[in-house]
Structure formats: structure tokens, C-alpha cells
């Protein structure tokens, strides 16, 4: 099961009906700034409850507002998702979402009015446009990682600790068994035993410190008003115990003493981001092996700019692992990026190109109709430098290095009379792409379909 198509209207940059087709497994969304990549991610988040941050609240800025003088903000927006490749269990679970054409779809309609304190949300599906049951929606797990991630905060101890969430998933089966038996989980029993030893043993001075506090309290307010005190490491409850745990790091995998591990606030931003993402992927791998509706039937992982704080080698390794995770677990992974490293590290069919416009245009490169020979050539040809063609506003394909150097200089002469900021190809967002040969035919159909560019081939 995966989301094969998303349709948006009236939401952010999407003033008119906009449709993007997505891949089963990994989708990498590329394009220039302001092309609508974040808008697609935000539209998906409107449909589901984010397991990291909860429901994505509707904001006034979510309603489209054009830039022309006199444009008014949209009074409503619509988001629809189409699901494909459902197995039998998924078909049964989401049967109520089938429309008259037997397509499984989820629809959201949000309206705003000046007299309303907050927008009205209508989430519906199926032939009868019935309201979606929360229990059914909870079968879809959505995890969103924003571009500016505070990985250290997410990995710190506390009620929202990512480490605690992972441990609860790992121990879920055992916790249910001990709850039915009326017994303590081994971790809880061990902590209780340790806390009892601390409180009662004279060797640690804990007992003495607690007695001093208790005596001072009784002297201050009297025995009839005083409260009992006890010094221990944690409350004897599984959730509280795992929420108090801290994740530490050491810079390599060599065998070291535990005292050499350090707090994550001493680690690099890039590695903290990797540890955070690794904890999420570990949970997804684990849940994929537990055929339990409580773990969700479908998982959606949305990551904006996974390249944040990572050098090129780590970017490539991370994206490969994301692709492997999608294939092994059935998780649908949707990534947005401005990294030519990531864009060149995936096959062409995984890429969706976004072009700025009113509305933006999304092109799934797998549907550009390239012959197999051309597709194989483009996949081999794209590298970190040449994948710039996926992000440029305009393109100039040239045969060799001489043209790549000469044409931008000629453009400066032609454009010198233009206002400042429009006097070079770079100013205009145009890239000269050196093909190192006369391979134009492999690229013209790709670019014509995705960006409708004019072209000249000698």
C-alpha cells in the first residue's frame, strides 16, 4: 500500500488544482526554491496525525493568497490522497474509503470564515462521503522530520524522548504479558530492587540524607503536617524509567570504557541528525516485523532536506539506507532536497521534479517516456555536477568545455544593458550543462516534458 497520487487546491502555492504522482518506496522531490516541495509535504501532513508532533494545525497562511494587487485569500482548500497496491488486510481495513470507481481515497476539505474562531475541517472518504473514523485513520502512521531538526532535543530524556518510544515498541509484547500476569517487567523489578537497596543500606549515605531531610521537615512544620520523603533514581514505572534514560555517544566503534561516552550536546549536528533518523528507522524496521494493527498498517516517512549538516559521503549512505528501508519494510519515504549529491545518488525513476508556477508543476521522471536506452544513459551520466539540471530554472545544453566557458561570457555581453541582477546566466537561474558530446537526444524529451523549455540543437 502506498500513496500513488496527491491532489491539492487552494493550499499555499496551489491556487488551482495540482496533482503529483508518487512512487512506491522512495520518492525524491527536487526543484528550485519556491517550487512547492514543502507545500506537498505540508499537504500530506494535513491528512494524517504526525507521530512525532501530533496533528498539524491549520494556519491562515495555509490558505492560498496570490501576489497580484487585489487578490483575496482563499476561503477553503482541498487535499486528496489516492492509495494503490493494497493487500487483502489493507483492503478490508480501508474498505469504507473506496469510492464508486473502487479507488481508495482520503479527502480533506478545510473552510475558513471571519466569524469562525478556527477553520472547519472535514475529513471524509468512500461512496457516501462518510466521516473518517479515528480508529481507521490511526492505522496510518506518519512521521515528519523538518528541515531544521533539533535532534538533540528529540533524543534527550523526557516524555517525548525518541529513545523511550523505541524501547516501548521493543518491549510492547512483554509489557502486555506482564500486565496480564500482574507481574513487573524485569527492568521495573530491577529498578525497584536497586531503589530499595539505596534507601535501606547504610553504605551509600542515601538513608542518612533522607533521614536528615525528613527530620528538618518535621521540625519546620510539625509531624501532623509533614510529608514522607524517599531518595531514589526513578519512579518504579516502565514509562518513567525509559523516559529518564539518556543516549550517549563515542566518535567511533572501538571498544572503550563506558566512562568515555559523552553527552549528545558535545556531538556534531550532523551525527546527532543521523542518530535521530537511525532511531526512527530502527522503530520502522521493528514494527514491520510485528503484524499488529496497533503498530499501523501503513507507514509514511516525510523528510525535508536529509542532507542537513552532512558531508557528501554521509548524504549518499543515508539515502541508500532510506531506499533499502523502504524496500524492506514497505514504508513509503518521501524526501525533498536541494542536494545535487542526493539527486545523483538515486535512479531517475525515483525523482519527481517540481517547477515553480501558478500553480507549480510536478513531473515524475519515470513518466517522461524516455526510451530504455536513453534512461540508462541518463542514469549513468548524472553525477553531482550534472544533476544541477534538476534544480536550475533554465538550461543550456552544450557539447563541450569550450562552449560551457564561452556561452556564459557571450551572455554577459548580450545582457550587459539589462538591470543589475539580470546581467548573467547565473542571475537568471540558467545553468550551462556540459554534455561532453552530442547526446542531446537523450535529454530533450526529459526537459520538454518536465519544464516545457525551448531548445536548439545543431
What are these regions, as identified by a protein language model?
Residues 327-328, 341-344, 348-457:
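RecA-like P-loop NTPase motor core
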Residues 78, 84-189, 428:
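Electropositive, glycine-dotted interaction segments
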Residues 49-75, 285-296, 328-329, 334, ...:
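Flexible phosphate/Mg2+-sensing switch loops adjacent to catalytic phosphate-binding sites
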Residues 74-79, 102-106, 138-142, 298, ...:
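Short glycine-/polar-rich loops that comprise or flank the Walker A/P-loop
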Residues 1-49, 249-387:
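Switch/communication elements of ASCE P-loop NTPase nucleotide-binding domains
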Residues 151-158, 164-303:
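Extended helical coiled-coil dimerization/tether regions that scaffold
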Residues 81-83, 146-149, 235, 249-251, ...:
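Flexible glycine-/small-residue-rich
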Residues 41-100:
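Conserved P-loop NTP-binding catalytic core
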